[in-house]
Every structure is written in structure tokens, then in C-alpha cells.
Amino acid sequence: MEKLTILLLVAALLMSTQGLIQSGGENRPKEKIKFLSKRKTVAESWWEGECLGWSNYCTSHSICCSGECILSYCDIW
């Protein structure tokens, strides 16, 4: 019974290391986290003046924090 337990543990260890190797190792999740952390929230963009808040005059959707420029004014979310 003890040998069977050890055998199962070794098999589980081998399967988990194989899964790490096939998925690109430990670097891939770190890259995703780094990519996602570069994005700013809407509040941060507004606070730093990178986009316009609700009810401001606008000429295109991209300059509004909400992404909606309706009748020349930024729309609320």
C-alpha cells in the first residue's frame, strides 16, 4: 500500500511538471500580469486629464472617458 501511494505521488508530480513545460513554464502568467497592470482605470485617466468626463464638449468618442460622444457632449456610462 505504501509503494502504491509513493507511485501515485510520483505520477502526480510528473504530470504537473509536464503541464508546466507544455504551457510555457512560469513566465507566461507573469507576462499577462505585466500586460494587464499597464492599463489605467477610467478614473485614473480622467484624474490625469487623459480623457473628458461626463457633460464635457467633445468632437469624437475617443476623447471621452465613457467612450460615448453624443451631440457634441460626453455621455454618461
From Swiss-Prot:
Organism annotation: Conus litteratus (Lettered cone)
Intrachain S-S bonds: C51-C65, C58-C69, C64-C74
Record's comment describing the protein's domains: The presence of a 'disulfide through disulfide knot' structurally defines this protein as a knottin. The cysteine framework is VI/VII (C-C-CC-C-C).
UniProt-annotated location(s): Secreted
Pfam families per the UniProt record, alphabetical: Conotoxin (PF02950)
Protein name: Conotoxin Lt7.1
Signal peptide (residue range): 1-19
InterPro entries associated with the record: Conotoxin
Stated family: Belongs to the conotoxin O2 superfamily.
Residues excised as propeptide: 20-49
Tissue expr: Expressed by the venom duct.
Taxonomic superkingdom: Eukaryota
Tagged with keyword Membrane: no
Keywords: Disulfide bond, Knottin, Secreted, Signal, Toxin
GO molecular function, one term: toxin activity
GO CC, alphabetical: extracellular region
